[in-house]
């Protein structure tokens, strides 16, 4: 399955967007899911017939369900009940089992996922605190940005933030180059956790899940 190498599209004179919707699962989450599964398989952490479980607001669930179907793994997705029906249908289409928790309760989804994995011996993708998530974006997303900009000066990199994998990986890349590129994380105003506020319900699915441990911009 071909993931990544998405185009950098010119939006205005000095503004570009990376078109991650062209990934097979329709989002940037295809990158860390493929990367983590590749490493797990390489290191013997996975075998055919294993069950992989993850808590997600949807995009990672779609990516994981799709790749589990391709690779011969069973898949369980734990998610808040208020996530879009389209996401649920996509996950179901790929044959994954969906377990719902109360709307907006992302911490509850993560806790249930961990408990189920421990009780039944499921393999956790563990996107929220898996260093492979960050490593993936350092080794793929960041490198693609460099190649597409011909190593020219990048004034700022802006990304919506859920797990923090994208922005942390790209940040580490620019730090290695010792550039003064500004790294800007975007979160919903209704759930300004990174800004020191309280989590709340909002309408932007996929970012701003509200768990304070998901993002560490000091790394």
Question: Model-predicted segments: where are they?
Answer:
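PLP-dependent amino-acid enzyme catalytic core
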Residues: 1-219
